């Protein structure tokens, strides 16, 4: 409906456009730009979004990014939404707000994977087709009984990368945070699924890739399982403030190792 209205409004000779309401473009709430300062938009799930009152509460790296980035040089906008996958972040309009807010020179960090693994058409219905192939399929949603086209993890990532570049921004693909699960003294890694798929899309598109998953996992391996518990919040996925700050600092470390201009900020 929105696209139809936009089409009508763009036709100068079409009388019907006078009956349209003013078109509203959704943007990121609370964004205040300062001259000469690029904006970093953080997109993702709860591991990026969360903020809490207590140190050992649930925290996301986007909420504490100020510990790793100089806010006198960049503006930080945490646009992540808890519980979202690439698919639901797009379908619910969260991505549109970011897209409409991007200006040339801005950075968009794209970090998903934890919720993309979920069911596609049952329960929370937020999962995607596994892999990076340019694949789609029509599924019947159990809750609504409506049909919906669902794409692959790689398709959604490539769309995000393309959209950011279309606006003159710089996309940065960030692999998902590691979970606090251990085997034989080493933390669990997802280098065979969502971690490697993020890397593959970066290689396909030429986008900057920060392997946060392994950067943080390497650090926690050195800390050991007992000490690593302090970086998480009572479950295997969500981090405490200490853990969120670690992820933010590892992200900054990855940017520096990649010689990203943003690392100077």
Annotate each predicted stretch with a short phrase.
Residues 1-2, 209:
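Ordered, small/hydrophobic-rich secondary-structure cores
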Residues 46, 85, 115:
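Gly/Ser/Thr-rich beta-alpha loop segments that engage phosphate groups in nucleotides
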Residues 3-81, 96-108, 124-132:
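Serine-esterase "nucleophile elbow" of acetyl-processing enzymes
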Residues 86-97:
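N-terminal post-signal-peptidase region of extra-cytosolic proteins
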Residues 52-56, 88-90, 184-189:
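Short, solvent-exposed loop/turn segments at secondary-structure boundaries
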Residues 16, 31, 259-265:
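N-terminal charge/polar-biased segments
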Residues 81-84, 178:
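Acidic, glycine-rich active-site loops and adjacent beta-strand->loop/helix elements
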Residues 97-241, 245, 249-263:
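Alpha-helical cap/lid subdomain in secreted, periplasmic
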């Amino acid at each position: 409906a929105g696209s139809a209205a936009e089409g009508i409004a763009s036709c100068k000779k079409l009388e019907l456009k006078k009956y349209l309401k003013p078109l509203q473009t959704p943007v990121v709430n609370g964004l205040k730009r300062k001259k000469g300062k690029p904006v970093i938009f953080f997109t993702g799930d709860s591991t990026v979004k969360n903020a809490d009152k207590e140190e050992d509460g649930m925290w996301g790296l986007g909420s504490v990014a100020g510990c790793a980035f100089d806010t006198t040089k960049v503006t930080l906008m945490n646009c992540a939404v808890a519980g979202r996958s690439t698919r639901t972040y797009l379908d619910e309009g969260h991505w549109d707000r970011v897209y409409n807010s991007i200006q040339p020179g801005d950075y968009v960090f794209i970090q998903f994977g934890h919720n993309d693994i979920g069911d596609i058409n049952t329960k929370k219905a937020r999962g995607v087709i596994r892999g990076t192939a340019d694949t789609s399929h029509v599924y019947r949603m159990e809750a609504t009984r409506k049909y919906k086209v669902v794409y692959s993890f790689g398709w959604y990532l490539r769309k995000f990368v393309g959209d950011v570049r279309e606006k003159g921004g710089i996309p940065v693909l960030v692999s998902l945070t590691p979970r606090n699960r251990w085997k034989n003294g080493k933390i669990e890694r997802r280098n065979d699924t969502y971690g490697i798929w993020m890397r593959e899309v970066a290689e396909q598109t030429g986008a900057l890739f920060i392997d946060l998953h392994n950067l943080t996992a390497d650090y926690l391996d050195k800390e050991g399982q007992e000490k690593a518990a302090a970086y998480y919040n009572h479950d295997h996925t969500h981090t405490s403030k200490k853990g969120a700050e670690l992820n933010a600092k590892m992200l900054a470390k990855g940017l520096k190792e990649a010689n990203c201009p943003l690392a100077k900020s």
